[in-house]
């Protein structure tokens, strides 16, 4: 998603509307998004990571944890993506579950999920802040939360 957004904003002259209403749905980009949102592939990655832990413990653990986080992400994605749903069971199926609710679209309750996500991020940031030792990392955490809050206010409130 970050590569897509970087390409669309820095490498083209597309408007924000063109990026999210057109380019996002191009088959090339959908295939890439669906690859990284595939529960079967993530399960294979977890299995490979667990197997690899016997030979390369740090690499195997990293792979298993990253792929497990993909699965967790997909379990949140499934009930919160409407017309922008992913093929979460690819390559076994091309089915897309189009939820009646959306994590971002205000017409489908997105403002409630976004508010929950913002509140969760702020609460967890208070917890994480105590772990951070340097002023730089603490400042980056505060900055990212202010950025998150700004986007929330701009998109849902103002």
Predicted segments, located by residue:
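N-terminal membrane-targeting hydrophobic helices
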Residues: 1-158
